[in-house]
């Protein structure tokens, strides 16, 4: 008689953590990168073309109102089960914060700076590249940070459609009533969200100069004061 000896090596929680972290980061990085490439031009178009801008903001706003689980389910008939539908859903969820912050950041650029750029003879493309986008950079970075943190949390639902990530141990733990498995996914997901937020806070201080931050805040304060005082002046 033949005896078959099988050596079964169980994965440790460290091994599972490594695999889940890789899958989770893959979902977040791919979807966020695609959203940045698409959303910033959409935000610029929304700021430059008023009528078209309202359509863009309304469209990305509607996507954001769809529940995340429903959006993932809608992707299954189109893309099947696994990573691709999860990436597309996360990509769509990432659009609104980046588009909105790009739009508001460009609108917050003071008219004085724009007039100075025009006086220097800069064409529209150069004004956008050299003046307006640098002034809006802090707002755009804030939108990307918001989208990244949202993605880290929402990506846990990708496990429901076979996307992997930290949601895998969470939902397995719920089915088995195993708190250890639930924490195996919940704790790293929370830590990753905090790390992402901290990383973007550091990037804000490194890539946005202190003088530019002060200029942006002064520009926003000036716009708010004009908005506050204009009705009072008309009433007088």
What are the language-model segments listed below?
Residues 101-146, 170:
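Short cytoplasmic-facing helical segments at TM-TM junctions of multi-pass membrane proteins
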Residues 50, 107, 183-236:
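C-terminal transmembrane helix and the adjacent membrane-cytosol boundary/short C-terminal tail
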Residues 16-28, 76-97, 137, 181, ...:
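Loop-to-helix entry region at the N-terminal start of transmembrane alpha-helices
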Residues 19, 26, 42-75, 90, ...:
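Cytoplasmic-entry segments and transmembrane alpha-helices of multi-pass inner-membrane transporters
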Residues 77, 154-189, 208, 212-217:
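Glycine-rich helix-loop "coupling/hinge" segments at transmembrane-helix boundaries
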Residues 1-33:
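Periplasmic/extracellular loop-to-transmembrane helix junction in inner-membrane transport proteins
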Residues 29, 92, 125-158, 180-184, ...:
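Transmembrane alpha-helices
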Residues 37-42, 56, 85-114, 144-152, ...:
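Membrane-embedded alpha-helices of multi-pass transport/permease systems
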């Amino acid at each position: 008689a033949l005896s078959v000896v099988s050596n079964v090596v169980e994965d440790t929680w460290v091994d599972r953590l490594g695999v889940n972290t890789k899958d989770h980061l893959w979902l977040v990085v791919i979807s966020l990168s695609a959203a940045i490439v698409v959303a910033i031009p959409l935000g610029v178009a929304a700021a430059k073309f008023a009528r078209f801008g309202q359509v863009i903001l309304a469209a990305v706003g509607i996507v954001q109102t769809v529940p995340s689980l429903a959006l993932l389910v809608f992707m299954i008939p189109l893309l099947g089960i696994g990573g691709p539908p999860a990436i597309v859903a996360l990509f769509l969820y990432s659009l609104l914060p980046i588009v909105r912050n790009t739009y508001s950041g460009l609108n917050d650029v003071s008219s004085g700076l724009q007039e100075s750029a025009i006086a220097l003879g800069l064409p529209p493309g150069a004004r956008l590249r050299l003046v307006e986008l640098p002034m809006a950079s802090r707002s755009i970075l804030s939108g990307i940070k918001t989208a990244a943190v949202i993605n880290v949390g929402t990506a846990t639902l990708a496990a429901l459609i076979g996307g992997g990530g930290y949601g895998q141990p969470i939902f397995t733990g719920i089915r088995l009533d195993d708190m250890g498995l639930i924490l195996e996914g919940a704790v790293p997901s929370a830590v990753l969200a905090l790390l992402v937020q901290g990383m973007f806070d550091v990037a804000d201080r490194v890539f946005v100069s202190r003088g530019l931050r002060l200029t942006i805040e002064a520009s926003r304060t000036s716009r708010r004061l004009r908005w506050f005082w204009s009705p009072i002046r008309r009433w007088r």
